[in-house]
Design a protein with these regions (language model features):
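Residues that cap or initiate secondary-structure elements
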Residues: 75, 102, 125, 162, ...
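Short, charged, solvent-exposed linker or helix-capping segments at domain edges/interfaces
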Residues: 76-78, 88, 129-132, 185-189
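N-terminal amphipathic/hydrophobic targeting modules at extreme N-termini
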Residues: 1-4, 9
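Catalytic core of Fe(II)/2-oxoglutarate
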Residues: 133-205
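Catalytic core of non-heme Fe(II) oxygenases with the double-stranded beta-helix
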Residues: 89-157
């Protein structure tokens, strides 16, 4: 009886605090359509994944909370996918960005960039998360994770809220910025173009 009495009081408190709805929603485990947030490319890296350490001795500059250094066209231009994307949409910046150990790059949407092409270069422990649902404003969120595969490019939706948690080693990521801002080049446009490009190339093989 005492246990039942305790749980009744506890449940009433949850109702009073408005947590009952939150708890029920958090118990659900809905399937998320991750292609709203990111899309894995079929084309694998042939050059950047092996040559990126060459640029780590360059000067690093602060860039939106990251440390960044450029990747020269002599390297990224050997990637057929990136060369084709650049011909269609034109890159403004192509480079490697670095996060320090034990660093949380908090929830945000990119200021100007609508989308990018990313590839994780170092595969120590880090997590890239996208918010899929706000359960309690500024407090509780559902999320999905982009689990980067080695040597793999991803179309990345910079206008969906995302964050990065990095642990004990520096984290290196290939990324790019386009000449077009978020109002001129959307994630959906880039994703669809890359999908068509890869389908055409696959049919030629």
């Amino acid at each position: 009886m005492r246990k039942m009495h305790f749980f009744c009081i506890f449940y009433l408190l949850l109702i009073k605090l408005g947590y009952n709805t939150i708890m029920l929603r958090m118990l659900k485990n809905p399937k998320t359509d991750n292609t709203k947030y990111f899309k894995e490319c079929n084309t694998r890296s042939s050059t950047i994944s092996s040559r990126w350490p060459e640029v780590t001795t360059q000067r690093w500059v602060s860039h939106y909370g990251f440390q960044a250094t450029p990747l020269p066209p002599e390297i990224w231009g050997q990637e057929e996918l990136l060369k084709a994307v650049n011909e269609e949409f034109k890159f403004d910046n192509v480079g490697v960005v670095k996060l320090p150990p034990y660093f949380n790059y908090g929830w945000h949407r990119d200021t100007d960039r609508g989308c990018s092409i990313n590839m994780l270069l170092s595969h120590d422990e880090s997590h890239t998360l996208f918010q899929t649902e706000v359960v309690r404003e500024n407090m509780d969120f559902r999320f999905t994770e982009l689990k980067y595969k080695p040597d793999t490019f991803y179309i990345f939706n910079s206008q969906e809220s995302h964050c990065v948690l990095n642990f004990k080693e520096p984290r290196f990521l290939f990324t790019c910025e386009f000449g077009q801002d978020k109002n001129e080049l959307s994630y959906e446009t880039l994703k669809n173009w890359v999908s068509k490009y890869e389908t055409r190339n696959q049919s030629k093989d």
